[in-house]
Amino acid sequence: MTTPTAIRRLDAADPDFARHLDHLLSWESVSDDSVNQRVLDIIKAVRERGDAALVEFTQKFDGLQVASMADLILPRERLELALTRITPGQREALEKAAERVRSYHEKQKQDSWSYTEADGTVLGQKVTPLDRAGLYVPGGKASYPSSVLMNAIPAKVAGVTEVVMVVPTPRGEINELVLAAACIAGVDRVFTIGGAQAVAALAYGTESVPKVDKVVGPGNIYVATAKRHVFGQVGIDMIAGPSEILVVCDGQTDPDWIAMDLFSQAEHDEDAQAILVSPDAEFLDKVAASITRLLPTMERAAIVETSINGRGALIKVADMAQAIEVANRIAPEHLELSVADPEAWLPQIRHAGAIFMGRHTSEALGDYCAGPNHVLPTSGTARFSSPLGVYDFQKRSSIIYCSPQGASELGKTASVLARGESLSGHARSAEYRITDPDWTAGNKEDGK
């Protein structure tokens, strides 16, 4: 007999619901002192010894015998070879996904703009791509080619000159799909290094690894901690927490569909979070039964069970309006609106990384091939953060061109404000350009 699921049940009508929800959502992401110190030691070694440190750490952590950095560089020809080593079906899927991701992200491109004022002053904004971006890809047989597409393609669409990928190959394990994805996405250089040492190499550069402007991509606690420490030296995408899915359902979707949607995130790792919110108590019972029945069929059943029972929940609400309130409170990475009329509720959704509309739009489609990016804010950071996109690989510069007349008029305002802040150098710099003799005579000060 199958043991019923032990997934947590919450009711928004409970006076202690807010406290229980806060406890459900809590997750400690801060590295412990030992991890922090190890990462700092690794970063220091890479900064001081460059390639030699990378070779040493690769031998130590990845179990590889390499003589030099030359053994840790994959040429373009090796990426092209990977395309021939995957199945035709896999290549077709990668190419189709890449095409859709590229098409979606093309629409995110920002253009420079300017306008001219009556006196000839020109104001504007110049959009410039980063020179070089670093992409971290987890290694081994469990690595994810979809992450290569989602990180590299927006960078190339943005116009980044060079995309540098690092991917460890523990015990020599190479994922041909990852290399094929890198080839299709247009990755320029690949180094088979990983961990905190790879992040340090990208941030500071070595004899072989070029210094980049931004580091993106997922990784373990050492990678995440290293990204925290190098932030400021380089930009980073985000410090991602465990994967999350929140399903809001009106009770009319097939319970098996919902259970499997919850599993789709729970199978990532034991800390992943899968939550269902519905006003239909009977439907919640049906989904619980589906979870119990389907769980033994999962390849990663142990991981799914730990995640579902440890951090998952079925939440009963009074109505759909309250379901949306709960969704906004959670600010999930992935939000499925599995309802009859998702468009009606969309305007009320304020906080979510990605919103999946309707019963047929499973989160898995967005993970792989719908087009929008699957690198999304987690741990409630959707309240102030956005999905990875082209804009993460572009920067903006303000453009100011003052005509003589414009400089004279703006100088008057700048002078008053600068002297109000007791910054006479600022004031006099502006005043030198004022051509109005009446203003100059009336505002002459000692030392001017």
UniProtKB/Swiss-Prot annotation:
Q: Which GO terms describe its cellular component?
A: cytosol
Q: Which gene encodes it?
A: hisD
A single Gene Ontology MF term assigned here is: zinc ion binding
**What lineage is this protein's organism placed in?**
Bacteria, Pseudomonadati, Pseudomonadota, Gammaproteobacteria, Pseudomonadales
**Name of the molecule in the record:** Histidinol dehydrogenase
Keywords on record: Amino-acid biosynthesis, Histidine biosynthesis, Metal-binding, NAD, Oxidoreductase, Zinc
Question: Per UniProt, where does substrate bind?
Answer: S243, Q265, H268, H334, D367, E421, H426
This protein's species is Pseudomonas syringae pv. syringae (strain B728a)
Q: Per the UniProt record, which EC number(s) apply here?
A: 1.1.1.23
Which family is it part of?
Belongs to the histidinol dehydrogenase family.
- Give the cofactors, semicolon-separated: Zn(2+)
- In what pathway does it function? Amino-acid biosynthesis; L-histidine biosynthesis; L-histidine from 5-phospho-alpha-D-ribose 1-diphosphate: step 9/9
The question of whether Endoplasmic reticulum is a record keyword is answered with no
